[in-house]
């Protein structure tokens, strides 16, 4: 039967599969498909893990549990992008994705061990309830701020390395240091 643990492990498997496809993609189209699979899995995983983090602690500790969980995302961004750049510069871009697969496997094992088994998936949500979310101005503003904030950060990461190396002539090792400082 499906419970939150089964769902989390399955989604982590999809994340790993997407990154494996990206690592060994023979064409740009398959690389994009792998990236889309991994990103969808990541978004779903973060959403569900937020709820699980809140549910496995006492009510007065929920905010701290969620904050701790998002600290992991922040650390992954601060360390992961420069580390991926470093791996790509000293090997090739494929190895950056292989490294993500290894981290994903560690996450899958940790999820299998640490997430409690008896956490059922909550009841079904009707579409009218979901539609109400998109009519709430405060929620919409929070969603837009989050999307544009993270989108802007990752867009900057996309162009930062080529600009630093091409325009400003920084060495690859200096770019890694700059990315760590930016993160």
Language-model features and meaning:
Residues 1-26:
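Conserved MFS/SLC helix-loop-helix module at the cytosolic interface between two early adjacent transmembrane helices
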Residues 115-143:
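Juxtamembrane intracellular "pre-TM" segments in multi-pass secondary transporters
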Residues 28, 34-72:
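Cytoplasmic helix-loop-helix junction between adjacent transmembrane helices
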Residues 26-30, 59-61, 68-113:
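Helix-loop-helix hairpin linking two adjacent transmembrane segments in secondary transporters
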Residues 13, 36, 67-75, 79, ...:
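Transmembrane alpha-helical cores of Major Facilitator Superfamily
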Residues 140-179:
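Extracytoplasmic gate region of multi-pass secondary transporters
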Residues 12, 16-19, 34-35, 101-108:
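A generic transmembrane-helix signature of 12-TM secondary carrier transporters
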């Amino acid at each position: 039967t499906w419970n939150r643990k089964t769902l989390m492990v399955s989604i982590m498997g999809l994340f790993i599969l997407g990154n494996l496809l990206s690592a060994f993609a023979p064409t740009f189209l398959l690389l994009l498909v792998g990236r889309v699979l991994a990103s969808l899995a990541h978004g779903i995983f973060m959403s569900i893990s937020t709820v699980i983090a809140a549910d496995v602690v006492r009510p007065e500790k929920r905010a701290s549990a969620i904050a701790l969980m998002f600290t992991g995302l922040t650390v992954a961004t601060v360390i992961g992008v420069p580390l991926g750049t470093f791996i790509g510069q000293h090997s090739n871009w494929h190895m950056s994705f292989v490294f993500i697969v290894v981290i994903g496997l560690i996450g899958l094992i940790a999820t299998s061990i640490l997430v409690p088994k008896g956490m059922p998936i909550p009841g079904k949500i009707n579409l009218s309830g979901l539609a109400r979310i998109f009519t709430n101005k405060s929620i919409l503003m929070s969603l837009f701020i989050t999307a544009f904030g993270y989108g802007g950060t990752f867009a900057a990461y996309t162009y930062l390395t080529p600009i630093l190396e091409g325009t400003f002539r920084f060495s690859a090792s200096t770019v890694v240091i700059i990315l760590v400082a930016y993160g």
